[in-house]
């Protein structure tokens, strides 16, 4: 034997029906050492251990091999009389399936139970009382199993599952034998089972639970399978009575069984209803398998056969008898698949919810759930079909609808895009500071409209004045635009967000700004306070930049003064001065009145929200009238304390020093009320007052420290420029090492000139300052690109309509940034419809070669304000023939540019009447024409003058003189009160009484 010798691993695995890996793992777990190789040797001990361990698996393999003989079963059926072992083997397989056809509960117990009780035929009688107790339909099939055939099958039952093979043998015999012979005997038992049906149905069900709960009562199960053989025995007794009916009523027998079961189960509780469902589904399943049995009676005719209800013991067996062909083939035709009870179960319990056939009982039991689910599925399918545009009936309609929906969606998307573009068109992307002219160009409106809107709102702005975020928002809102401020991120915010510890705050000096009209004595007042001669050093005696000074009063308290220009060109400077100040002093001359710049200064102070003190100057002059000034101020809603208002007022004389100390006391009083404090221990922050370029020192920035302490070596960031503080000096030129709050000073070390009004702050690292500076430069470049306007067709048409449009290109250079702004504003205001001023470039510092080259390329003139060109730039300008105009007073620069513009204007042609001639007689001369004898009544008539003939006040002819004679001599002119002869070129219809008027066209210089 194979067991006595060494075997290979693959052979053992095949024999035991187990995988090699399973064998190796099992042996390894038991301590055997074996290689994972199909050719590895298995010792006798190993094999004995494995065969004992996997005995069941080997048994299954044997059974499977026996099952494969199904093909021989067809030929072996002829020997059914002897009941060869082959038949029992098939019967076993079939019986397993039949038992499985019964409810799933009964399947498991039936297989083991079949061994003992095949011979006893009296078992059915003993079971009937038990059945009466139980009334269970499912085990009716089991009761039917008690038949003599079981005795013959004892041997086969012992080897495998017992009763099942017997059934199949009985079924197979009629299949191969002549159908008439075999069919007759089994048909007879069907009527008898009808009578027994009620009896067997009830006991069968009762036995089923017993079989399930207890394996020892094997007697019950043999009863189930032996009754199959009982069928021939019972028919033998009743053959004469119902043989004919059996033949004729094969279907009726099945139908009757179904009728009996269906009503009983409907009346029975839910459990019975479920069995009915199983029956119905088995019927449907039979019909489905009928395809294999094609020629024979449809398997669906005996659905009760697979049905384990057993109410009709003949039901399942007769089904095997009558539809012998169909049933064995239906169930056993493919035994391999359904052998593990899958065949019967499939049509039964598992498939119950998915059964397709029409089942009245099933429909009633689960009508709501299934119908609802189906409806839901239908709805979902219909909806999906609509969405996908599919369908056969309405395909074209759906496709058309889909195209329509698609077009609609595209139209909606396009509309949304246009709406977004319109919204973007109404959105301005600006930095926090932008000039009024740039803002106007972004909004595509005239700068005059912007200025007029601002004046209507009480804001005084100039063309190049830099507007802050609040002003930009207000102005843009007036024109219907939304403002989107572009910043470089949170890290570049110079606002001091952190709250200072109150314990670290100290008193600081008040920052006082002196504002007022030109020549009203602002600088003289500051001069007296500083005990110096500031005015004497100023060009033209007017202030042209913001001066910042720190003054110590007689009481020992410091005050920081800012002196602003009063000229209208310095509007932006005054606005900046009001923003960084604590208190504003408005200076008004007592011998003058409240002037436009005075009103503007008052407005700036109000916008900044700072307290105002009125100083009425020049009261020592004879024409001084302080009451008149107070009255005019009241018209501007400035009511002084003397008149019951809230504004302090002091009459002073800056020259004589009258009232100066009282004025300072009032300033200190306001400062005390404001409780001005600052933290000197943090990094410094402040504002840029002015910036200039010094040839020897580089960029010099005037700053005012608002909080913290600025020290030499600090990294500061101001606008788009940064640098390390190299030196600091105060207004007197004294070098400082550090500067505390409210201290004005000059700082050296920035890499550029920041714009006046920019905030500065001390950064931790130079890298951080450089990154933020580069981001700000990028924003400014983007903004300048957006604000740059190119010529449009409308503009070209406008210029052509004017006919003589001209453009004046100017490059502005000045000593400080504030002067650059003021001069640029003033020059831009000179633009007219015919002549447009273009500021190509403006900057701080001396004139360089690059400025000359730019002027040469663009045909521009250079206006220099308090700066001079370098030596190389001067030589290049002479070579390129570029005109450089240098000024020290802003008035002179403005006036000369205005004159240049007037020179660019086309002269206006005017008609001048030189003389009048009265026609007193008319002579017609051959070959000459008509000659008029005339008298010069007024003026002088010259030979080359143009003339017009006037008759009754109507001009009849305009032309030139053909001949002018006095007596016989041709003359060049005829004066008043002289007679002459005159003929007109190309006109002979001269009549007595006509007037001839001599005139000429003259060019008249135009003015702006």
Curated annotation (Swiss-Prot):
Name of the molecule in the record: Translation initiation factor IF-2
Region (G4) residue spans: 617-620
Location(s), subcellular: Cytoplasm
Amino acid composition bias (Low complexity), ranges on this chain: 294-329, 342-358
Principal location listed in the UniProt entry: cytoplasm
Region (G5): 653-655
The protein's role, per its UniProt record: One of the essential components for the initiation of protein synthesis. Protects formylmethionyl-tRNA from spontaneous hydrolysis and promotes its binding to the 30S ribosomal subunits. Also involved in the hydrolysis of GTP during the formation of the 70S ribosomal complex.
Organism: Cytophaga hutchinsonii (strain ATCC 33406 / DSM 1761 / CIP 103989 / NBRC 15051 / NCIMB 9469 / D465)
GN (gene name): infB
Gene Ontology cellular component annotations, sorted alphabetically: cytoplasm
